[in-house]
Amino acid sequence: MAHKFEIYKDKAGEYRVRFKYNSEVMFSTEGYSTKAGAQNAIDSIKKNGPNAPVEDNS
């Protein structure tokens, strides 16, 4: 599987999500106090991400 989401616990004890492609981290999220919060972030990205517009702020 080339693409995957990972939930992990950071040094501060918060749950974070990172999205990886071929072992390279493409992005990571803010910290969540619960694993359920991190899972909700994944669900939201999967639901809303495919149709999200690209905003170029360069």
Curated annotation (Swiss-Prot):
Q: What Pfam families does its record include?
A: DUF1508
Coiled coil regions in record: none
Q: Which Gene3D superfamilies match?
A: 2.30.29.80
Family membership: Belongs to the UPF0339 family.
**Protein's name according to its UniProt entry:** UPF0339 protein Msl4696
